[in-house]
Regions:
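Start-of-domain marker
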Residues: 1-39
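A cross-kingdom marker for long, charged
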Residues: 148-235
Length: 235
């Protein structure tokens, strides 16, 4: 996995405003290929840091003694648990729940302050609060099937039975379409597709015409950011 912290502003008080890009990939069975499982940019990371300062995280004392100092360690610990959660989820149905629950504990006990955001429901519709909420909300339980089916029943089977695996991945797109219809504009739907456009195009480029058309229609609807790319490359 990769964590890229990009500083955008600072002050004389050793306080930094930054964005954090989190990337993680999962090995695919019988190949050397790594499939992206997380590719997310968090634009709301404000923290205090003094050169050579030791960074420590205690899950029983998330806020620490200084909220701005602990905001960095809490954010990193949160995403570390989300990475583990999605990784375990892709190998075992609901296997990621223990890590999502740890991430939610961090959210519930997160540092609080005037310059700190991303931990609360009212901080926006796509932030740390909503990501883990979407994965633990029983109303959205189908997302556990989505992750498991996409990776374990789809991607992991591509080498041994490409047609069956592709059909499973198309079924995942249908599940996501149903989810999006019932729960429009949820963070987890957009989150799932980030970093996957090239992979999905390669999967469906060799599909039978009817499956390719259906996949293109669904992808253009579900992954609007890359809609033109799907339309052009999945003809």
């Amino acid at each position: 996995c990769n964590f890229l912290l990009n500083l955008s502003a600072t002050s004389d008080l050793n306080v930094y405003n930054a964005s954090l890009t989190v990337q993680a990939a999962r090995p695919i069975f019988n190949t050397t290929y790594l499939s992206p499982i997380i590719n997310f940019k968090d634009d709301n990371v404000t923290f205090k840091y003094v050169e050579f300062q030791q960074l420590e995280f205690n899950e029983n004392r998330v806020t620490g003694s200084d909220p701005l100092v602990s905001n960095l360690t809490a954010t990193i610990a949160y995403y570390a648990n989300m990475i583990l959660g999605f990784d375990y989820e892709s190998f075992s149905l609901r296997g990621g729940d223990p890590y999502f629950q740890k991430a939610q504990n961090i959210v519930n006990n997160a540092p609080d302050g005037r310059n700190i955001s991303g931990w609360k429901a009212f901080d926006g519709i796509r932030n740390r609060y909503w990501l883990v909420e979407n994965m633990l909300n029983s109303r959205y339980a189908i997302m556990h099937d989505v992750y498991y089916n996409y990776y374990r029943l789809g991607m992991d089977k591509l080498y041994e039975d490409e047609n069956t695996a592709r059909a499973e991945i198309l079924n995942v797109l249908n599940l996501l379409n149903n989810f999006n219809t019932d729960n429009p504009n949820k963070m987890i739907n957009q989150f799932f597709f980030q970093g996957k456009s090239t992979e999905l195009i390669k999967i469906f480029a060799k599909a039978p015409p009817q499956d390719k058309i259906r996949a293109s229609e669904l992808l253009q609807k579900l992954d609007i950011t890359n809609a033109a790319k799907y339309k052009d490359e999945l003809k």
